[in-house]
Amino acid sequence: MPSFDIVSEIDNQEVRNAVENAQRELETRFDFRGVEASFEWTSKETTLSAEADFQLQQMLDILRNKLIKRNVDPDTMEVGDPEHSGKTFSQKITFLEGIDAPTAKKLVKLIKDSKLKVQASIQGDQVRVTGKKRDDLQAVMALVREGKLGQPFQFNNFRD
């Protein structure tokens, strides 16, 4: 019986490269000359720090562009609120990985409401879809790509 898994993963190395490229661009941009602004990367989150709130927005746009160039979907970013401390503003960005329980339930409901002859089951941070026909599974893939559930999904472990 054919099956596949729906997962939500990001390549941490590509995200790190995008953050480093954004930092390099920040150092060469004219509007950031003489300004203390930086990107700080940790394993699951990035911290943006700058002297003004509008500079954080510019930095966020730079980071989005760099992520797109590195083939990382910017929808994986969860942007926190800007925090002001002293003379600097900082903003934390976390990268979503894995499918949380409410999103998995929405995904299963979306698949069941489509009336396709497939079964969807939640297995930890992924959703397994099984069906008798390969065409049904491909229809589910198209349905999930079209559905706007707030995060990007990948399909792996396709078995016949």
UniProtKB/Swiss-Prot annotation:
Keywords: Nucleotide-binding. Coiled coil: none annotated. GO terms for cellular component: cytosol. The keyword Nucleotide-binding applies. NCBIfam families: PRK05412.1. Belongs to the YajQ family. This is Nucleotide-binding protein TERTU_3542. It comes from Teredinibacter turnerae (strain ATCC 39867 / T7901).
